[in-house]
Amino acid sequence: MNLFNLDRFRFEKRNKIEEAPEATPQPSQPGPSSPISLSAEEENAEGEVSRAGTPDSDVTEKTEDSSVPETPENDRKASISYFKNQRGIQYIDLSSDSEDVVSPNCSSTVQEKKFNKDTVIIVSEPSEDEESQGLPTMATRNNNDITNLKNLSFFPNYSDNLSTVRQTRYSENLSSDLLKLIDSTSTMDGAIAAALLMFGDAEGGGPRKRKLSSSSEPFEEDEFNDDQSMKKKRLDHGEESNESAESSTNWEKQESIVLKLQKEFPNFDKEELREVLKEHEWMYTEALESLKVFAEDQDMQYASPSEFPNGKEVSSRSQNYPKNAAKTKLKQKCSMKPQNGFNKKRKKNVFNPKRVIEDSEYDSGSDVGSSLDEDYSSGEEVMEDGYKGKILHFLQDASIGELTLIPQCSQKKAQKITELRPFNSWEALFTKMSKTNGLSEDLIWHCKTLIQERDVVIKLMNKCEDISNKLTKQVTMLTGNGGGWNTEQPSILNQSLSLKPYQKVGLNWLALVHKHGLNGILADEMGLGKTIQAIAFLAYLYQEGNKGPHLIVVPASTIDNWLREVNLWCPTLKVLCYYGSQEERKQIRYNIHSRYEEYNVIVTTYNCAISSSDDRSLFRRLKLNYAIFDEGHMLKNMGSIRYQHLMTINANNRLLLTGTPVQNNLLELMSLLNFVMPHMFSSSTSEIRRMFSSKTKPADEQSIYEKERIAHAKQIIKPFILRRVKEEVLKQLPPKKDRIELCAMSEKQEQLYMNLFNRLKKSINNMEKNTEMCNVMMQLRKMANHPLLHRQYYTAEKLKEMSQLMLKEPTHCEANPDLIFEDMEVMTDFELHVLCKQYRHINNFQLDMDLILDSGKFRVLGCILSELKQKGDRVVLFSQFTMMLDILEVLLKHHQHRYLRLDGKTQISERIHLIDEFNTDMDIFVFLLSTKAGGLGINLTSANVVILHDIDCNPYNDKQAEDRCHRVGQTKEVLVIKLIGQGTIEESMLKINQQKLKLEQDMTTVDEGDEGSMPADIATLLKTSMGL
């Protein structure tokens, strides 16, 4: 019994004392040892009703001699539901889908409810006691001692002077062994815990800790679980007799779900499947996903029948595998709660919720259980000798950056650890860590957690390496045999169009991973035709007999392009567009459910797929064969709501298309892998998050461990990702040149920038939130681009005068001038300038053209545009800010340049027409685009110059924008010009972006020493096998 259950036990006893102080003592135990217990006869007469305040999962089998507090017979309820909170008890669930997101139940309980003094808070966190389904049954031999000892705990201040126990009237019922045990401890908590360990384990009735190497445990737990199952069946039968007709219908539905699940997993008992469904609130798809993960783990540990020449060896192995171990592991895998890995200090301060939440941040919190729990026993007080050496070696040799990976180890603590070196022995390490201010022995135990996490990642790497070797071996073998492997262009594709050689390699790679039951990421650089390769793959599946349905999820800006390309390349595929207003999507859903529509492929946008519960429900219930996600880097954050919702899409296979798989850090790449291969990676989510979440550093600052992490990531992603860059596959593609233009600010702009910088610098010390710091950065960026993005020229006096003049306008004659003034105060200079142009009475307040063009970047841009127009070049001009595009329109009109504009406000239906107009009308000189709206999936190869007026914090967004021109179909050399404000924050942004780009180079380049060796790259082998 851990202290959580002990506290709940006391609470129940205390309530029973208040409610039934005159209850009859149990005849089998005379005396005052159990003054609040019911008799055994009364207990048995009640039909095995569980004790009040205990959920069904905590009900245990009672022996004849056990004394259990119960609710009086008249007050007893017919059934106790697992999901109903008992009166006076608040359950707080610390489990959640993401480490960064607190469960809604938890937050509402903590923030909105005020607990009274009689309320017991039970923090619901998986523990070893949950495996034994509640409070353990004590051995009958020592049952009186333990019961008496627990009764003593209800005396006030019992723990202040434990010696007074001998003076109580209960001491006469205590055995000599128990009295000796009381003398050996200083608190009653310690006495009870020691008694449970001493007497409970002696008979096997104590708290059961899961031990992988135990030989006697399977039989004992098997018997316990079988009894538990029989009891649950009796309870279920009792509940059914009292339910209404509606409840009976619900029960029938639940039974049908159980039968449906049993068809998928015939080896599991119905009771086991019912428990899994209860854990997932009777959601069939979620329970199915969890069971698949469990089944996959079992397949990995025990060989399949195909590995043996006869079935006898397999059956003998399966017989040796204890039934209860499967049940235990099933419960661990399918419960959506984190399992404790290792925490030596868990017993200390166990009733502090803050400490529990704090500790849970470093527990293994993956969706389907932690792999640490499978490999290491939890909660052991003794440090194994094997880990002593590893910890000593790590703390002795690790760099400061590596030490900061230890949970709760800051940069300052890591610096202190390095100053304490050397650590010659385990005792010396313990002594130095304990006696140094700011450090504690906790760091040693947390270091073990880190080492375990690294072991998990290493196992995952080895697993991925095995898969990669199998794929390589098969392709090599097929290449040597010749023929039989090459997947030609599918015949149902448009015969007037043909795939390029590297696109055929991509199609063969997709077919290869599909045949091996894997999912993948097609990560070719932007402009290499990932869309065409995905369509060709769907055509290949169609010819193989897999006619769908498939789902394609795309950004809103590319949905028209996808529909066009599918109809052009493969008109055989019937496409259904799931897009439009809520009413339109409702009608489409009705047609899908009624099967009025015939389709092979559904095309929708990220927003339409998850925007409402009805949308999510459709794709959660609809059985899909393949789900393809275009611009897959939108799934780089595994903690986002979008990520969690899209994970629920019911598809057998997943394929991600992205031109930028690595953006800010390695964790984003791991998030993509977890999305496409959840069965393999979701059990190690927390370990992956911690091992790959550190920030990137410049090459000269990278430690050996940093480089090892990059090598580890490359090894993990190797079987699941295909990445080609243009320089490798398109020798005929014209080159792309980059040019940085440092733009000196105008005199007035520089003065305004420095004033803003100094003002923000003074207030920055008072800012604690990151959001406020981001706002500072944004204000500086806006001033570096153009002064009119702030309010400088329209002073408060001018605004008051303008607000009075606005009353003369027919639309504002009855308005309040104070409210008009407030609205004007939050507007920028350019917005106020546009307002003055709209209303006649404030026309005189318009800004002069000199002020509008007074920007350092505008001076440089004007000269560049004039030169390019003379050469006959065409320009695509990007900006992060739509208001900056408004000001750029004034510049282009002033210089009389023809232009088109596309941003986030442009209707989806109009975008494809604007793109076609620019590509066909060569007299249009400039295409204005916002980076976010126009940087994805748009083909603008008719232009050969890309100008980035202001760069993005994420350099891959800029790369996406650049490749609107530098892609298949481009015939001219592409020039990319980046305008950087000299002496501004943009110079620092440029340096950081270059560091992020370096990470991609590290991930995609070939390691030194690999050249000249046998080609191991799958793409290279496929190319060789196809004779390309």
From Swiss-Prot:
Q: Which GO biological process entries does UniProt record here?
A: chromosome separation; DNA double-strand break processing; positive regulation of transcription by RNA polymerase II
Q: Which residues in this protein are found as N-acetylmethionine?
A: M1
**Record: residues binding ATP:** 523-531, 899-906
Q: What is the protein name given in its UniProt record?
A: SWI/SNF-related matrix-associated actin-dependent regulator of chromatin subfamily A containing DEAD/H box 1
In the record, Phosphoserine modifications are located at S57, S79, S124, S127, S132, S153, S213, S216, S241, S244, S304
Localization per record: Nucleus; Chromosome
EC number of the protein: 3.6.4.12
Q: Which reaction is this enzyme known to catalyze?
A: ATP + H2O = ADP + phosphate + H(+)
**What is the primary gene name for this protein?**
SMARCAD1
A cellular-component GO term for this protein: heterochromatin
For this protein, the record's Gene3D superfamilies field holds:
P-loop containing nucleotide triphosphate hydrolases, Tandem AAA-ATPase domain
Occurrences of domain Helicase C-terminal (ranges) = 860-1012
UniProt keyword terms in alphabetical order: Acetylation, ATP-binding, Chromatin regulator, Chromosome, DNA damage, DNA repair, DNA-binding, Helicase, Hydrolase, Isopeptide bond, Nucleotide-binding, Nucleus, Phosphoprotein, Repeat, Ubl conjugation
Q: Where is this motif: DEAD box?
A: 1007-1010
- CDD domains referenced in this protein's UniProt entry, alphabetically: DEXHc_SMARCAD1, SF2_C_SNF
